[in-house]
């Protein structure tokens, strides 16, 4: 399997042989497991204060009073502490000691990563994610892109290679989030657009991340969630030549 290498003006400069990883079998089931496992490691443990609902001065009246034998407030007769009492503790609350992180076999995670990488070269899968682009996949650009330091210049390169329309799609579809998330630092729902994978960061990662929906990462830090946001593989991805060469050494 071969790919054309484009320069910063979108012109074909050479043709390279792609690593075997781009011919990997498509396994959406394993990709989903890997993404959910990665997401689970970001969950924070939560639970009530141990004293919630039980921090009362109470006594038990015992039998013979015609009342239920439950803890009662010392300054009155209303029930406290028990779950069925107003202001009492919860019956089975979430436990802060619960382990939220899901485990996955190393070989499965590796298989998922290889399958997600191969999906970026599948035009049908990429279009199913509503990405907009021109030309052939995968998009491989010369290593000159790694030293671009201005967002404006990155946008010009994306226009030249035919993927900037997807950035505009993400910008137009930004909207207010419904519900309580607006109060929790998640005011907008933003769409994912291009993923830029480079062999070495000489300034382009920070510049590219300023574009709507764009993620940029050094190839050694690549993970399944970046390649398949929301468990849906086939993200529109731009590779530099050095990143593709690194894949051949790393995963093949």
From Swiss-Prot:
Function as written in the Swiss-Prot or TrEMBL entry: One of the primary rRNA binding proteins, this protein initially binds near the 5'-end of the 23S rRNA. It is important during the early stages of 50S assembly. It makes multiple contacts with different domains of the 23S rRNA in the assembled 50S subunit and ribosome.
Keywords, ordered alphabetically: Ribonucleoprotein, Ribosomal protein, RNA-binding, rRNA-binding
UniProt name for this protein: Large ribosomal subunit protein uL4
GO cellular component, one term: ribosome
Pfam families associated with the record: Ribosomal_L4
InterPro entries hit by this protein: Ribosomal_uL4, Ribosomal_uL4_dom_sf, Ribosomal_uL4_euk/arc_CS, Ribosomal_uL4_euk/arch, Ribosomall_uL4-arc
Gene Ontology MF annotations: rRNA binding; structural constituent of ribosome
Family to which the UniProt record says this protein belongs: Belongs to the universal ribosomal protein uL4 family.
Gene Ontology biological process terms, A to Z: translation
Self-association and partners: Part of the 50S ribosomal subunit.
């Amino acid at each position: 399997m071969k790919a054309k290498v484009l320069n910063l003006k979108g012109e074909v400069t050479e043709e390279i042989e792609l690593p075997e990883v781009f011919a990997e079998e498509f396994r959406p089931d394993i990709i989903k497991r890997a993404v959910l496992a990665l997401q689970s490691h970001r969950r924070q443990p939560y639970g009530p204060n141990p004293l919630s609902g039980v921090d009362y001065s109470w006594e038990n009246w015992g039998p013979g009073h015609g009342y239920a034998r439950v803890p009662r407030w010392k300054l009155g007769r209303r029930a406290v502490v028990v779950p069925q009492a107003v202001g009492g503790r919860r019956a089975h609350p979430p436990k802060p000691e619960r382990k939220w992180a899901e485990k996955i076999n190393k070989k499965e995670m590796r298989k998922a990563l290889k399958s997600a990488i191969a999906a970026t070269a599948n035009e049908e899968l990429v279009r199913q994610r509503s990405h907009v682009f021109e030309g052939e996949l995968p998009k491989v650009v010369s290593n000159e892109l790694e030293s671009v330091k201005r967002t404006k210049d990155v946008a010009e390169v994306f226009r030249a290679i035919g993927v900037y329309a997807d950035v505009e799609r993400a910008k137009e579809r930004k909207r207010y989030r419904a519900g309580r998330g607006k109060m929790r630092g998640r005011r907008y729902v933003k769409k994912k657009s291009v993923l830029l994978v480079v062999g070495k960061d000489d300034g382009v990662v920070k510049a590219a991340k300023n574009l709507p929906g764009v993620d940029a990462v050094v190839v050694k830090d690549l993970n399944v969630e970046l390649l398949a946001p929301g468990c849906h593989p086939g993200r529109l991805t731009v590779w530099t030549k050095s990143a593709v060469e690194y894949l051949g050494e790393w995963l093949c």
